[in-house]
Amino acid sequence: MAILRTSEIRTMTIEERADELENLNNELVRERALTSAGGAPENPGRIGEIRRTIARIKTIQHELNEI
């Protein structure tokens, strides 16, 4: 899953943003589970990227009063 830019997030519909947020949260849980199980992540910076993208989506949702 690609990391989204702010401009890409703003052009999404409300439903697309909600779906993307759910997908990213699920991916974050999987990455954290892999790490906590002792596995080495394929991309160590991926967890931070996912967290930042989630924050971007939530910020834009708040700005647009979608929450």
From Swiss-Prot:
The keyword Ribosomal protein applies. Coiled coil: none annotated. One of its GO terms (cellular component) is ribosome. GO terms for molecular function: structural constituent of ribosome. One of its GO terms (biological process) is translation. Keywords: Ribonucleoprotein, Ribosomal protein. It comes from the Archaea. InterPro entries: Ribosomal_uL29, Ribosomal_uL29_CS, Ribosomal_uL29_sf. Belongs to the universal ribosomal protein uL29 family. NCBIfam families: L29. This is Large ribosomal subunit protein uL29. It comes from Methanosarcina acetivorans (strain ATCC 35395 / DSM 2834 / JCM 12185 / C2A). The lineage of its organism: Archaea, Methanobacteriati, Methanobacteriota, Stenosarchaea group, Methanomicrobia.
